[in-house]
Design a protein with these regions (language model features):
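Cytochrome P450
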Residues: 1-409
Length: 409
């Protein structure tokens, strides 16, 4: 399938199968457990020799890796549409999530009213709450001399920040809601509907209850007010619920992965840890590098609306393509020493937060959250390491997650 290699020797089918367990150029599958275990190696092999790979999974899809191609596909929504969803082999009956799974003018109408509620100025108001929540969680385990970072901190903090502070969801509901959102993101396709339905029902009721209360001028009120798609077409109720579900799914697990990966890196690299502890003003730049190197979105899909060619490979109208954001930011064509974490890198080019009209709406909050947490963590726990004999555990689908990280201090 792939007629798009760079200059050096392209591995044969037999060599790929021996190394990766399958021909990752012509039979790639991001749900393959072996991809989870060889994540970096597969991404780098695609970048080196096959920037447009093919998957035989289900109806099939193309896997677009190279930096410039990722930018092109992400920005050209007219050719690469979101209107049929961002996941290949979409289960029948799975509701579309607005504004992610639609095109302008629907998408742009929603982003116009939502973006102001996640602007840098607005999210800065959450900084003290993030500081307080971070220290409250650390207080629970600091005296123990160690923790399992994901269970004790990483899976909790983003939910607190988003649900409690941004949406105002009752704190008692957070554990269940965070777990359900995680399963909706990481469960196999055939099980995702169950968890999406649970989250959908909860947030549908949450919106109905909020509609009975006086307006607060927040994002929830903006969603309740809805948008006009045309002069004669208002957004229906199910679209309003869909918007809240979409933002919920995007606001939790993604931040957890970048944060956990940053903590793992600092645990294993004492020079970087000491530098950032002594220079907290440099944390913002370091967070960009962590986001570049540890992208939580493995790939997001589009449907091709016309025949095109990408990196020498013909893509037909109706074909499904996956934008491999996870690969693009480590493309050596766009980043020098791309496979190395360099917290001093300036600038830090990456597409971890996407590109084009569907660029991550919560990127400002994610940046603030990760930087603030790491600054507070280093104040309280300046020396820490990965527990000897333990090994971080990961899960990979269209998102990348870390499920276990044991650290000691």
């Amino acid at each position: 399938m792939a007629n798009n290699a760079v200059a050096d020797k392209v591995p044969t089918k037999a060599e790929l199968e021996a190394r990766f367990g399958r021909d990752i150029f012509n039979d790639f599958d991001y749900n393959d457990p072996r991809f989870n275990d060889q994540f970096n190696e597969v991404l780098e092999e695609h970048l080196a020799h096959c920037p447009v790979a093919w998957s035989n999974d289900g109806h099939g899809y193309w896997w677009i890796s190279r930096n410039e191609d990722v930018r092109r596909v992400a920005q050209d929504w007219q050719t690469f549409s979101n209107a049929k969803g961002y996941a290949p082999n979409r289960p029948e009956g799975l509701p579309l999530l607005y504004p992610e799974e639609c095109d302008p003018p629907y998408q742009s109408a929603w982003r116009k009213v939502l973006n102001p509620h996640l602007s840098p100025k607005v999210v800065a108001n959450y900084e003290q709450a993030i500081i307080d929540d971070t220290n409250e969680l650390i207080d629970r385990f600091i005296a123990k001399g160690g923790c399992e970072f994901i269970a004790d901190f990483g899976s909790i903090l983003p939910g607190l920040v988003f649900f409690k502070n941004v949406l105002g969801v009752p704190v008692d509901d957070l554990p269940w809601l965070v777990e359900s959102a995680e399963l909706a993101n990481f469960a196999p396709n055939e099980e995702r509907q169950i968890h999406i339905d649970k989250v959908w029902a909860y947030l549908d009721n949450f919106l109905k209850q909020r509609a009975k209360l006086p307006p607060r001028g927040d994002m929830v009120d903006a969603i309740l007010a809805g948008v006009k798609y045309t002069e004669d077409q208002d957004s229906p109720w199910e679209h309003k619920v869909s918007v809240l579900v979409d933002i919920t799914f995007g606001g939790i697990n993604t931040t957890t992965y970048v944060l956990a990966s940053a903590v793992k890196h600092l645990a294993e690299n004492p020079e970087d840890r000491a530098f950032l502890a002594a220079n907290p003003d440099k944390m913002v730049g370091a967070v960009e590098e962590f986001a570049r190197m540890f992208p939580p979105i493995v790939g997001m899909g589009r449907s091709c609306t016309r025949d095109v060619e990408i990196a020498g490979t013909p893509i037909k109208e109706g074909d499904f393509v996956m934008i491999a954001y996870s690969a693009s930011s480590r493309d050596p064509r766009g980043v020098e020493n791309a496979s190395v974490v360099d917290i001093h890198r300036e600038p830090v080019p990456h597409y971890t937060f996407g590109a084009g009209p569907h660029r991550c709406i919560g990127s400002n909050l994610a940046r603030l959250e990760i930087a603030t947490v790491l600054q507070e963590w280093l104040k309280r726990i300046p020396e820490f390491s990965v527990k000897p004999g333990s090994k971080p555990e990961y899960i990979t689908g269209f998102l990348r997650g870390m499920t276990k990280l044991e650290i000691l201090w």
